[in-house]
Design a protein with these regions (language model features):
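Single-stranded nucleic acid-binding proteins centered on OB/S1-type folds
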Residues: 1-177
Length: 177
């Protein structure tokens, strides 16, 4: 009842492209909605691949335990937590089930079958590591910065098609006086 809405006298441009930024610039902003970063995957963190989530709160279970709900039967899921570095800084990129399945090259059911055959859930994360570590990727998503560092909840994650030498030259041009 105390809100007033006033129409703008101008048109607002809608842009489907996310702004591309260097990691350091994006992190310094404190958080961004819909940003694009390009960098090399340095590591795929533990807790990637096949995971279990609490059916009540969605948190990832650790040894069958939810931090909030205790001992609980989890629901199967997949994710990737990757460290991406562009030379100016690093960010943790979190891929949901759909993006993880795309990266893995199969469904969660395929991944679970591979883990059963190997009798080891880590085979899925290991295969993803072999695919991405050391390669340059373009990531788009929402960036948040907190006490644990910077993270991006990815909406897109794909191998970069840019010339790495040209990107390196452009970066050096920006940072050299």
């Amino acid at each position: 009842e105390f809100t007033t809405i006033t129409p703008l006298a101008r048109e607002v441009e809608v842009d489907d492209d996310a702004p591309r930024m260097h990691v350091a610039e994006a992190v310094a902003s404190g958080g961004l909605f819909d940003v694009e970063l390009v960098g090399n995957v340095l590591e795929v963190r533990d807790g990637s691949g096949l995971i279990e989530r609490c059916p009540d709160c969605g948190r990832v279970l650790q040894n069958g335990q939810c931090r909030v709900h205790g001992d609980i039967d989890g629901e199967d899921d997949m994710r990737v937590k990757a460290i991406v570095d562009d030379g100016t800084g690093t960010v943790t990129v979190i891929l949901d089930r759909e993006l993880t399945e795309d990266l893995y090259g199969g469904t969660m059911e395929d991944a679970m079958a591979a883990a059963r055959d190997a009798m080891d859930k880590e085979v899925v994360a290991d295969e993803i590591r072999e695919t991405v570590v050391g390669h340059e990727f373009r990531v788009r998503g929402n960036l948040s910065v907190d006490d644990y560092g910077a993270s991006v909840e990815a909406s897109e994650f794909e191998r970069s098609t840019e010339d790495p030498a040209a990107r390196a030259t452009a970066l050096l041009t920006e940072v050299r006086p």
